[in-house]
Every structure is written in structure tokens, then in C-alpha cells.
Curated annotation (Swiss-Prot):
SUPFAM superfamilies: Class II aaRS and biotin synthetases (SSF55681)
The organism of origin for this protein: Gluconacetobacter diazotrophicus (strain ATCC 49037 / DSM 5601 / CCUG 37298 / CIP 103539 / LMG 7603 / PAl5)
Marked site: Lowers pKa of active site Cys: 154
Full protein name: Octanoyltransferase
Localisation: Cytoplasm
Sequence similarity: Belongs to the LipB family.
Length: 232
């Protein structure tokens, strides 16, 4: 007997780009994918990559939160949020979905639920490495608490853009970036807290390990079955 659920499960394209992808190239790639999703010529997609050292400004970014505009290339991202750093050792996952349809626990046309579920995806991914990620009601992203000092540091950022209910941009999880590079901005406009990474917490995992954890935790939340991770 065939499993009817297996026959009707929706898949989503997952792929990863080797090397460092310049930020403008990523924007162009997402714009092309989003246009295809809208007209039915391209599938929904999760795109895994790293950027060269880059500062990006969300729609709420303030000039005074960028300390050295000439330190790294700086781009207006068009996504929600404030200043973000991207660089080697940080796993960026760009998620492109048609939100006019439900996706797992995310109802159709519910942006708040979508953002909440992106955070939950990161929290479940971190749990696979014995790291407790937490939400904060007044701060978007995922946070960890230093058991020794009680300090809260950000380990993952997220920012999304929605165009006619097709979403793009996504999440950035700090695996092993140079944390000093964050010093050129006030990350996400939050001065009271710092940033951390899996390596800084003592978990010497690879980007590949993180990719598999992201993929393993996807389906229960978003409903679709990830394809094997291919090369973009």
C-alpha cells in the first residue's frame, strides 16, 4: 500500500553556494527566484551561503549606528530591521516562499507567524548542538545566556522582506565568524548586548554540520520536504 502522505508531500529546493557570494549577487539571485515563484516558473527555495565581510542596512537602520562606513562594503538591504554584519563563518539561509499558501505551522498571509517560526527553526537547530537559544519579546533574533555571567548575546539574526506575499531574505547564524568585525556597527540597533557564535561557546561545528541541522529541523515547522542540498 502506498503512503498517501508521502505521495502528496511538497518539496522545497535546498542548495548551497561554495565560496563567498558578494551581497549584490545574492540580491540579484533572490530577485530572480522571487519573480519566478510569483509567475510559477521557479520553485520555493532555501539558499545557503556565506558573504564576504559586509554591512547591510535594513529599513530601520540609523546612520549613527554605523561607526566606520569605509571598513567594509555597505549596502541597503531593503529588508526589515537595522544594521547587520555578514561575513565568513556565518551561515546565511535565504528563504523564498509564497506566503499566500500555508506552510506547515505558518498560516497563509501571516507574517508574524512566519517570523516567529523562523526564530523557532533557529532555536531547534541550536538545540541539536546542546545550545539553548531564546527569544526576547522586544528583540528580534535568537539569544543565548552566558551561564557564568548572565550576559545575553545574540547568536542569530533575521530580517525578511515580503513582496506581494512572496518572502525573501532570511536568517544568519553565527557559526565561527570573526566577532570583532561586528564592532563596526550596533548590531540590530541594540547597544546593551553583544554577539556570540557556536565556536565562541565551545562548539566547534562546521558549516556543513549546521546545514544538516537546519535541514533536519525544517519539515516539522514549514511542512515541505527539503531536497538534498545541491550546489547553487
Amino acid at each position: 500500500m502506498h503512503d498517501r502522505r508521502a505521495m502528496t508531500e511538497k518539496t522545497i529546493l535546498w542548495n548551497s553556494s561554495p565560496g563567498l557570494v558578494p551581497y549584490p549577487d545574492a540580491i540579484a539571485g533572490m530577485e530572480h527566484q522571487v519573480a519566478g515563484i510569483r509567475d510559477g516558473s521557479a520553485p520555493e527555495r532555501v539558499w545557503l551561503l556565506e558573504h564576504p565581510p559586509t554591512f547591510t542596512a535594513g529599513t530601520s537602520a540609523r546612520d549613527e549606528d554605523l561607526f566606520n562606513p569605509h571598513h567594509f562594503p555597505t549596502y541597503a538591504a531593503g529588508r526589515g530591521g537595522q544594521w547587520t554584519y555578514h561575513g565568513p563563518g556565518q551561515r546565511v539561509a535565504y528563504v523564498m516562499l509564497d506566503l499566500t499558501a500555508p506552510h506547515g505551522v505558518v498560516p497563509a498571509r501571516d507574517l508574524r507567524a512566519y517570523v516567529h517560526t523562523l526564530e523557532e527553526w533557529l532555536i531547534r537547530t541550536l538545540r541539536r548542538f546542546d545550545v539553548t537559544g531564546e527569544r526576547r519579546a522586544d528583540r528580534i533574533g535568537v539569544w543565548v545566556v552566558d551561564a557564568r555571567t548572565g550576559a545575553e548575546n545574540k547568536i542569530a539574526a533575521l530580517g525578511v522582506r515580503v513582496s506581494r506575499w512572496t518572502c525573501w531574505h532570511g536568517v544568519a547564524l553565527n557559526v565561527a565568524p570573526n566577532l570583532d568585525d561586528f564592532g563596526g556597527i550596533v548590531p540590530c540597533g541594540i547597544r546593551e548586548h553583544g554577539v556570540t557564535s557556536l565556536h565562541a561557546l565551545g562548539h566547534k561545528v562546521s558549516l556543513g554540520d549546521v546545514d544538516e541541522a537546519l535541514r533536519a529541523t525544517w519539515q516539522d515547522l514549514f511542512g515541505s520536504v527539503p531536497t538534498p542540498i545541491g550546489t547553487a
